[in-house]
């Protein structure tokens, strides 16, 4: 069951109605997959798409964890005999894990603290006396509480003990913590300084050696860069609660917040100085340390979430890149001393030939003859060249082959080889090619990923594809969960050929486990090709529920029923039968008949189970059966004579392929072995909030070279072709830093966060985001 308040919360967050959320949760709890629900249960969910469902799934998990923790806390406090009606009401009302833990803090079992020791020593009456009645002189009052046998040796020890009691009491006040937390989040700065003596060793973090910026607005890439610097022992991070002052003040404004909350008024009474000291201790020793850790954790969590989302978007774009299709392809895995590895696959992706050539070590003529012979023998239409070391040299070699052998007409394409080496050494590659040398397997992968990027890349751990922003600095569990969802959604959006798909590809189909995928391939090997979807039920361990989830995403071309090659689910075949009866046409005549299908009204074919959304989808599918949602295949043409960074000149206009998109811009491969950066401010003449709205991985773009830094291996590019090299770095058309409103401007202290212009001298994260070779 789903809590009604949870339904309302999630509905507001995903722009849906509570009843839609409730219906989706029921479907998920029944074991239905997100791709299945999104495509085949639109009537029940009101048309929630896969993105909404994924967000719902994530938020639902959080809220259920919250509820489980809430019940555990209520039980714990109740067993202590301290659960009041007001406390129970507050605990039941909160929807934040942080607030929940704040409420539990005073009752949470903990090690003996100094405050507890002081209470055991009988000092609580002293603490209450001095706090409530400041007319008492602290030293005089404390003299009555000196108990040497209890560890209270003198009045100073008694007063310190009383301070600890009050400090711990106030630091566990949930309402007080909420006020200070809110102030810090809105006003504090995150401060980064270099650890003394680490300047040279940590040079890549030098932009953060003396840096501060508002805590709540620090971009994810800068936050993760600073956290990485701290983890490597180069940077120290802290919070400045009072950034409006040049130097840290003697008293923080947070101390005033604490005093106001506690109703403390100072009137020069004998105990006022001591009480002021209690407030100072509460802030500096307890609250600041607690909230600094917590808020930095919040910043890191937000930064990690953004980084994971960036990775997910880039992975989605890479997986959904245009396939070259059923064309015989040669894969060239470039190398210098070790040679260029060659693999030829036929139109179906089957490996038909391999070789190793040495065009860069004095054997170019022999290598050219080998390539030409393979191209002619196997009717090669495309040549995929890996983009790693010696890529441009290998590309130039192939162009020479075409000049020498006019019959070699296969189009060359530079292909990202990220992850190819990981695949080569994997258990899966060993199973596919047990007798093939590891070094040649990479060439096979390069060829196949040009034919069908999705089918080949699913064989590789997404984290090895290298299109992520600080992917090694984030929660690997959350990253894996997110990326698995992306792969699943992409595979099911495209659909899978049941008779040719590999085990890794089948494993990503909704409802199928790895064991089921293996059993499908085993059944196929033993019985030949599937002729209809119903034969899936003959596969071991694939029962009715799994069939329901997977059948619509599995295609059978040239089988018994043309509908088996479409996205129409077998459960909806009766709807098609009604359409055929109404149009008095045979299925093969109706499929693709746009003029006939566009005259149909979806509402004429609905029933209790299938409403207008599903029938509309069926009619669209009949019009264009088996349509591929991926774009048309296009390639970037790198400029002749531009092969290394030394060949680049400011002002050059080049064509390139977007390899990676981050929150601060896009990296573009222009064929010089080092991706250039188009900063967010140079993506468009209009303001750009999110680079992903302008470009995506795989896009072919025209760029102008603005700056080349050979020493740091930085290339600054712009997609605003009217932008001139050397122009000011001030933001003109975009960027993601906005003015701070509703708060006094902080005076500079050290280096403030600067709007990073489109300079090759970006901070260290440009290196981290560079192409993985």
Curated annotation (Swiss-Prot):
Residues 651-720 form the S1 motif domain. One of its GO terms (molecular function) is structural constituent of ribosome. GO terms for cellular component: cytosol. InterPro entries: HHH_9, NA-bd_OB-fold, Ribos_protein_bS1-like, RNaseH-like_sf, RuvA_2-like, S1_domain, S1_Tex, Tex-like_central_region. SMART domains: S1, YqgFc. GO terms for biological process: nucleobase-containing compound metabolic process; response to ionizing radiation; translation. Pfam families: HHH_3, HHH_9, S1, Tex_central_region, Tex_N, Tex_YqgF. Keywords: RNA-binding. Residues 721-773 are annotated as: Disordered. This is Protein YhgF. The lineage of its organism: Bacteria, Pseudomonadati, Pseudomonadota, Gammaproteobacteria, Enterobacterales. The gene is yhgF.
């Amino acid at each position: 069951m789903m809590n009604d308040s949870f339904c309302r919360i999630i509905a507001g967050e995903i722009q849906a109605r509570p009843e839609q959320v409730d219906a989706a949760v029921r479907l998920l709890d029944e074991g239905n997959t997100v791709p299945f629900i999104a495509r085949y249960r639109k009537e029940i969910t009101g048309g929630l798409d896969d993105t909404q469902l994924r967000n719902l799934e994530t938020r639902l998990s959080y809220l259920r964890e919250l509820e489980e923790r809430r019940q555990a806390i209520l039980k714990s406090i109740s067993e202590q005999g301290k659960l009041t009606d007001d406390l129970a009401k507050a605990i039941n009302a909160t929807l934040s894990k942080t607030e929940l833990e704040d409420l539990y803090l005073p009752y949470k079992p903990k090690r003996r603290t100094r405050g507890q020791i002081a209470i055991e020593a009988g000092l609580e009456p002293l603490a209450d006396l001095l706090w409530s009645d400041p007319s008492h002189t602290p030293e005089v009052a404390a003299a009555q509480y000196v108990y040497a046998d209890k560890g209270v040796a003198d009045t100073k020890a008694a007063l310190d003990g009383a301070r600890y009691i009050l400090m711990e009491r106030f630091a566990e006040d949930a309402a007080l913590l909420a006020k200070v937390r809110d102030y810090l989040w809105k006003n504090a700065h995150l401060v980064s300084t270099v650890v003394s003596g680490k300047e040279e060793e940590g040079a890549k973090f030098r932009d953060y050696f003396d840096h501060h910026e508002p805590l709540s607005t620090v971009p994810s890439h800068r936050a993760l860069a600073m956290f990485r610097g701290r983890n490597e022992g180069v940077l120290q991070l802290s919070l400045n609660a009072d950034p409006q002052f040049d130097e840290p003040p003697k008293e923080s404004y947070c101390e005033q917040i604490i005093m106001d909350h506690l109703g403390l008024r100072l009137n020069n009474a004998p105990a006022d100085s001591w009480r002021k000291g209690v407030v100072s201790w509460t802030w500096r020793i307890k609250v600041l340390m607690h909230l600094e850790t917590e808020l930095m954790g919040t910043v890191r969590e937000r930064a990690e979430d953004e980084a994971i989302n960036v990775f997910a978007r880039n992975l989605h774009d890479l997986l959904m890149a245009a396939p070259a299709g059923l064309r015989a392809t040669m894969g060239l895995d470039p190398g210098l001393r070790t040679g260029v590895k060659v693999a030829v696959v036929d139109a179906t992706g089957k490996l038909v030939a391999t070789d190793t050539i040495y065009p860069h070590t004095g054997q170019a003529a022999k290598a050219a003859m080998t390539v030409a012979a393979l191209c002619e023998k196997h009717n090669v239409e495309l040549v995929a060249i890996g983009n790693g070391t010696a890529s441009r040299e290998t590309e130039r070699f192939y162009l020479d082959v075409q000049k020498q052998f006019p019959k070699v007409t296969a189009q060359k394409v530079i292909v990202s080889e990220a992850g190819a080496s990981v695949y080569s050494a994997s258990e899966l590659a060993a199973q596919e090619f047990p007798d093939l040398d590891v070094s040649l397997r990479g060439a096979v992968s390069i060829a196949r990923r040009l034919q069908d990027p999705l089918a080949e890349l699913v064989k590789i751990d997404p984290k090895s594809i290298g299109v992520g922003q600080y992917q090694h600095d984030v929660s690997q569990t959350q990253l894996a969960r997110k990326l698995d969802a992306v792969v699943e959604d992409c595979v099911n959006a495209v659909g899978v050929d049941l008779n040719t798909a590999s085990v890794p590809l089948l494993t990503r189909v909704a409802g199928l486990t790895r064991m089921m995928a293996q059993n499908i391939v085993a059944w196929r090997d033993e019985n030949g090709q599937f002729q209809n979807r119903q034969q899936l039920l003959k596969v071991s361990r694939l029962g009715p529920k799994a069939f329901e989830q997977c059948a619509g995403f599995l295609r059978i071309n040239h089988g018994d029923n043309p509908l088996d090659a479409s996205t129409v689910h077998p459960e909806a075949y009766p709807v098609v039968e009604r359409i055929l009866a109404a149009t008095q046409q045979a299925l093969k005549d109706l499929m693709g008949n746009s003029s006939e299908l566009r005259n149909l009204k979806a509402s004429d074919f609905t029933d209790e189970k299938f409403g207008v959304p599903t029938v509309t989808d069926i009619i669209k599918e009949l019009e264009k059966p088996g349509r591929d949602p991926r774009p048309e295949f296009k390639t970037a043409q790198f400029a002749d004579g531009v092969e290394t960074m030394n060949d680049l000149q400011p002002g050059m206009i080049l064509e390139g392929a977007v390899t990676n998109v981050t929150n601060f811009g896009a990296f573009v491969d222009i064929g010089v072995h080092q991706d250039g950066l188009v900063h967010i401010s140079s993506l468009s003449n209009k303001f750009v909030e999110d680079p992903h709205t302008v470009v995506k991985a795989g896009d072919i773009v025209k760029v102008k070279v603005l700056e080349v830094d050979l020493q740091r291996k930085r290339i600054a590019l712009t997609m605003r072709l009217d932008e001139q090299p050397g122009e000011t770095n001030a933001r003109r058309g975009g960027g993601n830093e906005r003015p701070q409103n509703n708060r006094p401007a902080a005076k500079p202290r050290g280096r403030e966060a600067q709007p990073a212009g489109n300079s090759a001298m970006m901070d260290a994260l440009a290196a981290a985001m560079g192409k993985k070779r």
